[in-house]
C-alpha cells in the first residue's frame, strides 16, 4: 500500500469517526432532511456585489445559503453551490456547541449557513455564521488534498468528483444543456413536432452500423438497441405528421475514439415537401443563430483555429473535395465519375494512398475512404459535402442528373462530420432493391450493412411525400461549442472498460 493511499485511508477513518460521533450525540443531525435556502451564491453576488461595506452594514440583510465546503481558512469557509461560490465567516459570535461543530468541519462537507451578509476588507461578500447545520458529511477527501484530479481516466470514471472540483467541466455540461435547449426551441419555432420513437427494434435500421443485441424474455426473441430512429420517423411522415424531430440516444456497437462513444445523442428531423438543399439552408440558419444566442458571436475558437458559423457555408461534392485537397496528385485531378465507377481503378488509387482495403468495399465505399483520409481532416470551417454515391446511401434519393450519386450531404466542421442529411428515397421499389443490395453486402462480410425491413417497404407503399431528413450529432456539436477535442469531455458518463 502506497503512502498516498495510507494517508487517504487515515482521513477517511477520521471522517467516519466524526460522523459516528454525530450519530451518537444526535442521530437526526447525521443526515438532516431539511434546510431552507433563500439565495444561491450567484444571486447574492449579482444583487449585492456592488454595495459598499457600509451599505451592507446598514442594510442588515439576512440570508440563508447551502453548498459544499471547498476551502477552510481559519474562520473563513468557501462554499460552492450550483451557481458559484461565496464565503461564510465563523467569527466571535461562534461559541460553544456551534464552535465545536465548526471545528469538526472538513473540506467536501455540505452545510447550510444563515446570517447577515457582509463585505470583507478585500471586497468579498460573506455570510456571518449565526446559524449553521451540517447537511451531509463527506467521508472521502476531495482529490486536490493529495494530487488534484488531473488524470483523465479518473475524471471520466468519477465524474461526480470532476464536477465538484473542475469548473471547466461544469461549464462544459452547462453549455451542453443550453445547446440542446436552443436546438429544441429552434425546431419548435419552425413548427416541428417533438416525438419519441422506440429504443428497441426488431430490425435495426436507419444507418450503416453494427447494433447491440439483447433478448426479450417474454417474447423470446432477439431485439436490437436502435442505431438510428430514421425509419420510424419517416413512418410518421407517411402517417401525416409533416415535420417531426427527436432528440435521443443511439447505440452502435463500435470502437471507442475521441469522436466515438457506443451511446451518443442525436437530433434527427424530417420535413415533408422539402429537399436536401432546404436542409442545408436550415442548418446554416440554426447553427448561426444558436452560436450568436449562446456565445454572443458567430465566431468561436476551436483549438488553434477560429471557426465561423456566420455563413454562407462552403458546398463541395465529395469528388470536388478530394480534388481540392490533393492538388499534387495528377490521377485524382483528372478523375471523373466514370472512373469512380470502376472498382479496380478505385482500389488501385486507394492502395496508392496507403489505405488498407476491405475485399467487400464498393466503388462508393472506396471514394468515401479516400475522402476520409485525404480531405475530411482539413475541413475546419463549416462545409457541406454533397454527391455521396448511392451504394453508401441506401435510404437517400438518387440525383436526377447522375444516378451514381444521391441528393445527400454531410456537414463538416473542425475536421469532423457533425450532421448527415438527404432528400429521402420514397420510391418503394428502389428502396426494396437497395435493401436487397445491403443484404448481399452483409452476406459478403460487411457487418455494418443494413437489414431488410419489409414493414418499412409497406409504409413507403402507402406513400411518403417528397421529404428531406437530417441527423445532427449533439455530442460533436457540443465539442465545438466548448472547444474540447474528445467526445468523453462532453458526455457525463462515457463508456469505460471496467477497472481490474
From Swiss-Prot:
Claim: Cytoplasm is one of the keywords in the record: yes
Disulfide bonds: none
Transmembrane segments: none
EC number: 6.1.1.6
Similarity field: Belongs to the class-II aminoacyl-tRNA synthetase family.
Residues that, per the record, bind Mg(2+) 2: 417
Stored PANTHER family: LYSINE--TRNA LIGASE, CHLOROPLASTIC_MITOCHONDRIAL, LYSYL-TRNA SYNTHETASE
Main location as per UniProt: cytoplasm
GO cellular component: cytosol
Compartment(s): Cytoplasm
Swiss-Prot/TrEMBL cofactor(s): Mg(2+)
UniProt remark on cofactor binding: Binds 3 Mg(2+) ions per subunit.
Keywords: Aminoacyl-tRNA synthetase, ATP-binding, Cytoplasm, Ligase, Magnesium, Metal-binding, Nucleotide-binding, Protein biosynthesis
Gene3D superfamilies per the UniProt record, alphabetical: Bira Bifunctional Protein, Domain 2, Nucleic acid-binding proteins
Catalytic activity annotation: tRNA(Lys) + L-lysine + ATP = L-lysyl-tRNA(Lys) + AMP + diphosphate
Positions with a binding annotation for Mg(2+) 1: 410, 417
Protein name: Lysine--tRNA ligase
Keyword hit for Cell inner membrane: no
Single GO BP term: lysyl-tRNA aminoacylation
A molecular function GO annotation: ATP binding
Quaternary context: Homodimer.
Amino acid at each position: 500500500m502506497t503512502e498516498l493511499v495510507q494517508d487517504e485511508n487515515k482521513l477517511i477513518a477520521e471522517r467516519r469517526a466524526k460522523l459516528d460521533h454525530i450519530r451518537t450525540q444526535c442521530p437526526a443531525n447525521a443526515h438532516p432532511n431539511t434546510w431552507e435556502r433563500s439565495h444561491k451564491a450567484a444571486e447574492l453576488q449579482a444583487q449585492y456585489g456592488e454595495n459598499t461595506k457600509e451599505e451592507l452594514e446598514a442594510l442588515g440583510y439576512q440570508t440563508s445559503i447551502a453548498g459544499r465546503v471547498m476551502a477552510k481558512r481559519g474562520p473563513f469557509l468557501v462554499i460552492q453551490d450550483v451557481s458559484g461560490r461565496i464565503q461564510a465567516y465563523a467569527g466571535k459570535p461562534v461559541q460553544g456547541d456551534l464552535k465545536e461543530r465548526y471545528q469538526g468541519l472538513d473540506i467536501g462537507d455540505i452545510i447550510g449557513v444563515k446570517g447577515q451578509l457582509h463585505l470583507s476588507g478585500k471586497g468579498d461578500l460573506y455570510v456571518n455564521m449565526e446559524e449553521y447545520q451540517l447537511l451531509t458529511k463527506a467521508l472521502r477527501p476531495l482529490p486536490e488534498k493529495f494530487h488534484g484530479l488531473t488524470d483523465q481516466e479518473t475524471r471520466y470514471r468519477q465524474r461526480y468528483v470532476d464536477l465538484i472540483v473542475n469548473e471547466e467541466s461544469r461549464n462544459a455540461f452547462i453549455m451542453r444543456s443550453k445547446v440542446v435547449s436552443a436546438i429544441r426551441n429552434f425546431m419548435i419555432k419552425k413548427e416541428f413536432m417533438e416525438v419519441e420513437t422506440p429504443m428497441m427494434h426488431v430490425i435495426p435500421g436507419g444507418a450503416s452500423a453494427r447494433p447491440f443485441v439483447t433478448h426479450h424474455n417474454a417474447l423470446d426473441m432477439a431485439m436490437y438497441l436502435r442505431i438510428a430512429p430514421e425509419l420510424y420517423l419517416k413512418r410518421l411522415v407517411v402517417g401525416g405528421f409533416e415535420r417531426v424531430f427527436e432528440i435521443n440516444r443511439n447505440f452502435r456497437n463500435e470502437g471507442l475514439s475521441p469522436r466515438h462513444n457506443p451511446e451518443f445523442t442525436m437530433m434527427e428531423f424530417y420535413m415533408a415537401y422539402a429537399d436536401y438543399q432546404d436542409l442545408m439552408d436550415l442548418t446554416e440558419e440554426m447553427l448561426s443563430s444558436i452560436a450568436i444566442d449562446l456565445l454572443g458571436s458567430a465566431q468561436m475558437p476551436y483549438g488553434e483555429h477560429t471557426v465561423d458559423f456566420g455563413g454562407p457555408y462552403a458546398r463541395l461534392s465529395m469528388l470536388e473535395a478530394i480534388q481540392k485537397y490533393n492538388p499534387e496528385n495528377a490521377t485524382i485531378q483528372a478523375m471523373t465519375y466514370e472512373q469512380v465507377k470502376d472498382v479496380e481503378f478505385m482500389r488501385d488509387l486507394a492502395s496508392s494512398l496507403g489505405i488498407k482495403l476491405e475485399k467487400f468495399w464498393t466503388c462508393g465505399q472506396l471514394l468515401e475512404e479516400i475522402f476520409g483520409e485525404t480531405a475530411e481532416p482539413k475541413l475546419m470551417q463549416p462545409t457541406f459535402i454533397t454527391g455521396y454515391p448511392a451504394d453508401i446511401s441506401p435510404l437517400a434519393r438518387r440525383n436526377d442528373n447522375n444516378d451514381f450519386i444521391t441528393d445527400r450531404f454531410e456537414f463538416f466542421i473542425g475536421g469532423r462530420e457533425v450532421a448527415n442529411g438527404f432528400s429521402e428515397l420514397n420510391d418503394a421499389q428502389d428502396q426494396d432493391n437497395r435493401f436487397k443490395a445491403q443484404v448481399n453486402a452483409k452476406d459478403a462480410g460487411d457487418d455494418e450493412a443494413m437489414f431488410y425491413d419489409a414493414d418499412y417497404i409497406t409504409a413507403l407503399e402507402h406513400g411518403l411525400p417528397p421529404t428531406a431528413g437530417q441527423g445532427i450529432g449533439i455530442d460533436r456539436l457540443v465539442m465545438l461549442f466548448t472547444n474540447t477535442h474528445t467526445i468523453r469531455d462532453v458526455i457525463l458518463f462515457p463508456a469505460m472498460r471496467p477497472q481490474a
